[in-house]
Amino acid sequence: MPEMGVFLLATQAMAAPGELLNLALNAGAIAPEGAVLVAMLATLLVDLAGEQAAARWVPPICYAGLGTALVLLAQQWNAPLEPSFLGAFLADNLAIAFRAVVALSTLLSLLISWRYAEQSGTPIGEYAAILLAATLGAMLLCGSTDLVSVFVSLETLSVASYLLAGYMKRDARSSEAALKYLLVGSAAAAVFLYGASLLYGLSGTTSLQAIGIALLTSPTPLAALSLVFVLATVAFKIAAVPFHQWTPDVYEGSPTPVVAFLSVGSKAAGFALALRLLVGCFGAFDNQWKLLFTVLAVLSMTLGNVVALAQTSMKRMLAYSSIGQAGFVMIGLVCGTEDGFAAMVLYMAAYLFMNLGAFACIILFSIRTGSDRISDYAGLYQKDPLITLGLSLCLLSLGGIPPMLGFFGKIYLFFAGWADHQYLLVVVGLVTSVVSIYYYISVIKMMVVKEPKEASDVVKSYPSIQWSTIGMPPLRIALVGCVVVTAVGGILSNPLFQWANNAVAGTPLLQEAIALGSQRSIG
């Protein structure tokens, strides 16, 4: 019947736009972020039912959301690449790897948070919701391929981080940390917006790939100026010198579980942003931004590890240590080779476990003593062998002592740097690694070598462990898990390195940059 044929054609014509829109959106790419979002909304709803309901249901909701996100990320691994949301997001292997680091850092941060929140009287529903919001922003930032999505994701992460830093409202140091973080972060956001506006004006598009092509065909002085603004924002997010001033104060004043997340999750998102922007947009200025990052890496490794020697607070010491660690990761970024990018991804995964393991020990010590001073750890081995062993292994790994996981992470970075003729970075990295070993071992020596009569007053009155207390079992799971991976992961580092290699091989952006770099070196 002619009428039926006309009807079918009309139906197909009406369905076609919807199908095209579905293909253009490809919403399945952000299914892991959807799981985190659902967990965040459920946490807020449960929190409305009262503190008792929140204490009972918020932890399992968070575990379910983050666990689901990790499973969905595993399913996306090596999947066919399709741009999402009209080209604003891409779930390539690089994005999946960094999103997994962010999600896992949040999961471990939550495990070490519950006892801390219970003892300090912090409402866990609001705290968990804000932390999940920061996680959502960080995960979206790892896969953003458009200036608009980059800015929205960046601000989602930043605003949630400001709230987390000042969450202990009655603590003057927490409020001070939040204010400093807000002021410096707002300035960084303004600088990024100015750089992004220059890029849009020069290219007429917000797509990072299209911007990179436009700058390759017609590089201009204004493009170089935009590079400076964008690089300043990236350096702020990864706490590179000289954009590091906020780090020690924020780390010292913020709640310790928040610091644990910022030191890993936020930093991982920052390095993912660096790869998307610098490698993706500024291929025309490859030599220039690599030179600038070489300077930042040298300054970060030197200042971070040298100033850490003089610290008396554990959190401030780890703050300067994290600045130095960022310098090590930048070696892989400057190399721009397949080995360099893979070593960068591997070291971020290793840093996740060894740094969060150290923070788990610090939290366990602080909730039992209320102290953060390094001198108060004197003689701790006599009263708490678990914290002593766990903190010692994590600090040795951060220092790069074999056969810990951190040693193999640094070896891969230094090998990639040497192969790419980055001799200055490798030499500075080796020297500053030796410096870092000194202050890490100083803490270990204080805990282990001190005689009982030389123990600090805090350790002498150290309370016995009650593992059945609310929030203690998850803390023990996180601590033991991180310490085991840190200690054993070095011996079994080959699968991790294979995973990092696959992350680079499954990312067209990095493969194009590697090929372009090879052509330039041959030419």
UniProtKB/Swiss-Prot annotation:
Main localisation: membrane
Keywords assigned by UniProt, alphabetized: Membrane, NAD, NADP, Plastoquinone, Quinone, Thylakoid, Translocase, Transmembrane, Transmembrane helix, Transport
GO biological process, one term: ATP synthesis coupled electron transport
Annotated signal sequence range: none
Location(s) in or outside the cell: Cellular thylakoid membrane
GO molecular function: NADH dehydrogenase (ubiquinone) activity; quinone binding
Superkingdom per UniProt: Bacteria
Catalytic reaction list: a plastoquinone + NADH + (n+1) H(+)(in) = a plastoquinol + NAD(+) + n H(+)(out); a plastoquinone + NADPH + (n+1) H(+)(in) = a plastoquinol + NADP(+) + n H(+)(out)
A Gene Ontology cellular-component term: plasma membrane-derived thylakoid membrane
Transmembrane segments: 29-49, 57-77, 94-114, 123-143, 147-167, 182-202, 221-243, 255-275, 291-311, 317-337, 345-365, 389-409, 424-444, 477-497
EC number: 7.1.1.-
Membrane topology: Multi-pass membrane protein
Pfam families noted in UniProt: Proton_antipo_M
Enzyme class: translocase
Assembly and interaction partners: NDH-1 can be composed of about 15 different subunits; different subcomplexes with different compositions have been identified which probably have different functions.
NCBIfam families named among the record's database cross-references: NDH_I_N (TIGR01770), PRK02504.1 (NF002701)
Classification via HAMAP family: NDH1_NuoN_1
Family note: Belongs to the complex I subunit 2 family.
Job of this protein: NDH-1 shuttles electrons from an unknown electron donor, via FMN and iron-sulfur (Fe-S) centers, to quinones in the respiratory and/or the photosynthetic chain. The immediate electron acceptor for the enzyme in this species is believed to be plastoquinone. Couples the redox reaction to proton translocation, and thus conserves the redox energy in a proton gradient. Cyanobacterial NDH-1 also plays a role in inorganic carbon-concentration.
Record protein name field: NAD(P)H-quinone oxidoreductase subunit 2
Biological source species: Prochlorococcus marinus (strain MIT 9303)
Lineage, highest ranks first: Bacteria, Bacillati, Cyanobacteriota, Cyanophyceae, Synechococcales
